């Protein structure tokens, strides 16, 4: 994890079969679910299993939701992620609150990010 002037960046491995694809994601504790670009869902070969109503900076919208296998901070887990077009944005993935619960990560923006030692 890296703290930049504007956000916290996290290296996340996304798995398709056994080969991981690693991306730099933006940690977004205000997002209930992770969010990935459509191009990543195509690369991973995942299909939507439901839709969700999402509130974003662009207003309310419905988005497709997929299951993805991710790993960061040494823990691999399966989480839901919404699909969106992230062209022109810095990060192809937002790491939402749903990915933090199993990861034992504490975020204190004023000071640092702490991961529990195993």
Features from the language model and the residues they span:
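Pepsin/retropepsin-fold aspartyl endopeptidases
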Residues: 1-118
């Amino acid at each position: 994890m890296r703290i930049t002037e504007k956000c916290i960046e996290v290296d996340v491995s996304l798995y398709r079969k056994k080969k991981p694809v690693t991306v730099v994601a933006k940690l977004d504790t205000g997002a209930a679910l992770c969010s990935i670009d459509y191009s990543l869902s195509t690369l991973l070969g995942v299909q939507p299993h439901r839709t969700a109503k999402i509130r974003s900076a662009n207003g309310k919208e419905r988005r497709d939701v997929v299951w993805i296998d991710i790993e960061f901070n040494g823990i691999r887990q399966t989480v839901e992620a919404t699909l969106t077009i992230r062209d022109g944005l810095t990060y192809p993935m937002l790491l939402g609150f749903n990915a933090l619960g199993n990861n034992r990560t504490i975020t204190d923006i004023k000071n640092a990010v702490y991961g529990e030692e195993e």
